[in-house]
């Protein structure tokens, strides 16, 4: 199903004309309304009139998370605060949150973007959404809530946590769509197996999972444990929140709402644009946002873009599954390591649960890497030889795929703490 066929299936030349008009208008808008960008333009010797089409986007300055923190809280606002109707914020490593501002029009645009996603998943006004993303400053809960409301569906605003209550309301209210992080969905899948009701009594059919990277193997696990069709929803608070991109029924990539958020793929080291299909850093430019528009915002997400028409009929660009983040990438003894690679290896082996914790340290100037992994209940045993065999099997597979030796420590089922939000998978104790 398609929510907005005129946009989602638009001829790409026509879409490019819309993007060009909007970018020209946005360059004027930020120059006259955001002192931060006016200063950037002046430092570069750039005038708004120099931006004549979407091809000129490469002339615009980059924006990064540090710029948002340096202008905390409202230094990047493009309208008076009297026009701001919603303030979201995400936590940062400095302790100072990244603040995002929305006008009424921005919220309507965001709800439209998420409506496209939910409709692509097959959801309608007849569905009951259980929104188990966190509500509050995090964009996930309220974003999914407003998108579901916009298509006319019923919403259970349960937020994250309180797993027993999640299962009770999911069962009693007949929830058909679950919105949460994939790691929390795995936790709910475990809870469903152990709860008092058989899975056949639940009406769940669709999962909209995002806010953290996940793999195809994890999708299979989620679909099996929850009895659903699992879809990826992509977003980041700085750009809008969930709904920046979404999968269709073909699941051959994530369609990006590029009439609102213009994507580029850059070389993460040089900042130069990369050709279609090349892995690089994803960057977004707001084309319509009023409250706090950003130019060429560097997400640090690593992916590639594809512009050929999808079999679903949509012409919106498709993004590959996020491999990881530039700033999530670990360099251990000279090898680039992404948490998503580790997860993929674990999920291919039937003896292990998809819950792990990587602890990286430096001893005597040498990197060490300990990987704690849960063994499934059916395979966990007191027999030392069997457990050592499992350990060696996983270590060999990790070395084969990633090219690095890990010291694997096997733990009992549920031996790794669960998260109701984004899963913490890495502890890096090195002083780099």
Q: Residue ranges of each PLM-predicted region?
A:
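AMP-binding/adenylate-forming
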Residues: 103-117, 128-187
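AMP-binding/adenylate-forming catalytic core of the ANL superfamily
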Residues: 178, 288-404, 421
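Adenylate-forming
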Residues: 185-203, 220-225
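Conserved AMP-binding/adenylate-forming
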Residues: 205, 214-309
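Nucleotide 5′-phosphate-binding alpha/beta core
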Residues: 1-89, 94-112, 116-120, 216, ...
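Short helix-loop-beta connector
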Residues: 123-127
